[in-house]
Every structure is written in structure tokens, then in C-alpha cells.
Amino acid sequence: PGIEERTLRAMLSAEGLRGVVLETFGAGNAPTSEWFIRVLEEAIDRGLIVLNVTQCRGGRVMMELYETGLRLQRIGVLCGHDMTTEAAVTKLMYVLGLELPREQTLDLLRTPLKGEFTD
């Protein structure tokens, strides 16, 4: 809340940035402003990986549950299920460090490797 379009756009355009962890509300809901979705979609279209995790202490991301999560899913945001923020950052760093083709990278992020999330 409170972030402006130019700030988000600048953050997602940082040189060398390949992935981000998006901490969302509850079951994976983010702001619904058109500009917010558009900026995320543009970043994903440029190849940025966005991994959605909940900022709640318990629970999980279920992007199909509410319209706001569905919008994120439709533009290519990945579901972090019940991964903690720390696990998501670590996994993203590890998988991106493998320097694999994009589809393999996305497949690894969608698959539990060491129990970091439950299906």
C-alpha cells in the first residue's frame, strides 16, 4: 500500500534484476489498481520472474480463490503456496543461479525441491 507507479516501475527495471518475491495479503491478494497490474505484467513480459507469497504468519497463497489473485495468475505471477518469504528468496536465488532456460527455471520454482512448500 502507498507505493507509486514510478517507484514500482523503477524497482522492477533495476539493472540485472531477474526475479522478485511479492509479499501479498491473505491468500495472495495484491492491489488491484490497473497501473499496478500493468507494471507487473510489463516486467514479466521482459522476463522478470515474480513469485507470490503471503505476508501472513500462517496460511498459503491460493491465487485462484479471489479475483485479485486470479489477475496476478493470469499475467504470469507464480504461486508461492505456503512458502515463507525467506524460503522464497532463497529458492529464487538458487534456481536463478542455475542459469537454466526460462521454462526449466519456472518448472523448478513450481516444484517443491526440499520441502519448502506443500502442494
Regions found by a protein language model. Give the residues of each.
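C-terminal accessory domains and tails appended to enzymatic cores
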Residues: 3-14
